[in-house]
Every structure is written in structure tokens, then in C-alpha cells.
């Protein structure tokens, strides 16, 4: 009887272990399924955020309605903020492959690699715009002088490196950023735009947003969809994207963005001081 009991116990133990293993396998499969579903929900939520953000930006733009006039030239201005980085180099490679031009609103970096990228941007027919030397909001938006000093410092670096003196810029966060009011007072944004124009420069916001800065890493399809939907029905699309070090999916999205914009009839140009700007309503 002792051996029989041991055998029965062993069978029961094996049965329990098999049951546990089966349960764990099912549990793991459920966890994986929930994880995948959660990722899909995040992407769907981001897409909804894209719609909301595009609507907000549309409301902020001055004279922003898409043109309904047929058969007019359509120009796309791809713009990349917050570089240079290794992503900038990959973006330049893609632009070269597609024979497309872009504008890079750069920040200050005096490494040899960054200087190489400043030079390459200009040498390959693209444009450089100023985006402040430091991109530290609490510093650059303290006052009109602090903002302009950051721009001058960056302008001198770019000019010394490339021989080209930039005359266009983009406010970090856009011209309607609330950080101007938070750090510099209610009148700072207005005084800055007037100062920029007095000095013979132009600033550019955007009317199409790739949404690649809405969270640390936005999926490639969401970026592509945001740009192509935002550009639909326009004759001029100033597209906001980013080439900061973390923006790997922006690089991945770029070929589909270029192909999609070409399919909509766009040709690619660089921003210049006399390009029709997109301006947000000031805070």
C-alpha cells in the first residue's frame, strides 16, 4: 500500500505541476495579449491627441485655412527642430535619396561632429534657421535681451562654421508658447516678434505637425498619418518634425512622408526670409 500511495501522490503532484504550467502558459499569453492591446490603445490615444492638437494649432494660426483654389503650385517645407544629432545625418541621407530639400532649425553645439552637420546641411542645398543656442526655456525667455543673445550666439556659430548668416528662426515651443509669459511677462512675445522684424529677420511657426514630440517616442505610422492628413487641401505646408537624438521614428517615417506629399502634388522647398510665414496668434 505504501508504494501505491507514493505512486498516487506522485501522479497528483505531476498533475498539479502540469496544471500550473498550463495555467502559467495561459497567463503569459494573456499578459502578452493585454500588452499588445495596451500598445494599440496608446497608439489610438496618440492619434486622438493628434486630431486634438491639429485642431488647436489650426485655431491658433492666422489666416490658416487650407486653400480651395485648384491647380496652384503646392510647396512643402519640411522643417526639423532641435538638431543636429546622428538623426540629422540619417535625415540628410534620405533627403538626398529623394532629391528633397528641408530647413533645419538648429540649436548650439560646438563639437566637430555638429559642425560637420551644419556644413553638410548648407552644402547639400538645405537651409539653417535659428532655434536658440541652449533651448533652455527658463533662460531664453527671461527677457527680450536674453532671447536675442541666445539667437546671436547661435547665429555667430553657424556663420563662422558655414559662411552663411541665418536670417530665419523658430521660437522654441512656437511663438504662442506660454513660457514667454511665465518667464518674461505678458508682453514678451509681442516685443520679441517686433524685434525680430526690426532686425530684418523672419520667424516661422508651422501649419502641419508631425506630432513626434507629443511623447518620447511616437510610432512611425502615427507620424506619417499626422503629416499627410495635416497637409491635405493646402497649397503651402510648413511641416514640424524633430531631429533630436531620441527621434528615431521620425527618421523611419520620413520616406513615407516624402512619398505621400509628392503623391498630393507637393514639391519641396527651403524656407527663406521672404517665404509666406505661418504665424500663431500670440499669447
Model-derived features: positions:
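Membrane-targeting and insertion segments and their boundary/processing signals
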Residues: 5-8, 12-15, 121, 125, ...
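Structural detector of well-ordered beta-strand residues that form the stable sheet scaffold
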Residues: 103-105, 129, 170, 204, ...
Amino acid at each position: 500500500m505504501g508504494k501505491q500511495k507514493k505512486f498516487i501522490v506522485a501522479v497528483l503532484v505531476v498533475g498539479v505541476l502540469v496544471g500550473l504550467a498550463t495555467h502559467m502558459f495561459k497567463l503569459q499569453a494573456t499578459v502578452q495579449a493585454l500588452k499588445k492591446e495596451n500598445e494599440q490603445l496608446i497608439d489610438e490615444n496618440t492619434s486622438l491627441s493628434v486630431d486634438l492638437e491639429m485642431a488647436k494649432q489650426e485655431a491658433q494660426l492666422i489666416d490658416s485655412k487650407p486653400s480651395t483654389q485648384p491647380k496652384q503650385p503646392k510647396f512643402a517645407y519640411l522643417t526639423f527642430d532641435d538638431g543636429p544629432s546622428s538623426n540629422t545625418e540619417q535625415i540628410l541621407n534620405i533627403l538626398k535619396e529623394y532629391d528633397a530639400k528641408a530647413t533645419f532649425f538648429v540649436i548650439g553645439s560646438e563639437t566637430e561632429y555638429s559642425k560637420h552637420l551644419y556644413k553638410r546641411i548648407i552644402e547639400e542645398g538645405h537651409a539653417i534657421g535659428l532655434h536658440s543656442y541652449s533651448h533652455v526655456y527658463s533662460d531664453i525667455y527671461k527677457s527680450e535681451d536674453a532671447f536675442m543673445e541666445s539667437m546671436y550666439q547661435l547665429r555667430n556659430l553657424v556663420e563662422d562654421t558655414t559662411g552663411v548668416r541665418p536670417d530665419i528662426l523658430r521660437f522654441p515651443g512656437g511663438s504662442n508658447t506660454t513660457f514667454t509669459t511665465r518667464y518674461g511677462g505678458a508682453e514678451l512675445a509681442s516685443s520679441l516678434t517686433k524685434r525680430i522684424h526690426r532686425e530684418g529677420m523672419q520667424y516661422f511657426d508651422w501649419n502641419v505637425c508631425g506630432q513626434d514630440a507629443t511623447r518620447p517616442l511616437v510610432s512611425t505610422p502615427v507620424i506619417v498619418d499626422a503629416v499627410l492628413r495635416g497637409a491635405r487641401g493646402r497649397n503651402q505646408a510648413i511641416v514640424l518634425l524633430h531631429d533630436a537624438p531620441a527621434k528615431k521614428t521620425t527618421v523611419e517615417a520620413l520616406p513615407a512622408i516624402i512619398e505621400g506629399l509628392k503623391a498630393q502634388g507637393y514639391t519641396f522647398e527651403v524656407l527663406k526670409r521672404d517665404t509666406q510665414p505661418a504665424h500663431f496668434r500670440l499669447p
